[in-house]
């Protein structure tokens, strides 16, 4: 699953984590196993 942290991510948590650029750039987008 995926957890998105912070309001600064303009994408939903799942979409943000699927986007590696976003998830690496924004530390609040994190994967959870």
UniProtKB/Swiss-Prot annotation:
Subcellular locations according to the entry: Secreted
Pfam families named in the record: Toxin_12
Keywords, ordered alphabetically: Disulfide bond, Ion channel impairing toxin, Knottin, Neurotoxin, Secreted, Toxin, Voltage-gated sodium channel impairing toxin
Keyword Cell cycle on entry: no
Cysteines engaged in disulfide bonds, as pairs: 2-17, 9-22, 16-29
Family stated for the protein in its record: Belongs to the neurotoxin 10 (Hwtx-1) family.
Name of the protein described by the UniProt record: Mu-theraphotoxin-Osp1a
Organism: Orphnaecus sp. (strain Sibaliw/Philippines)
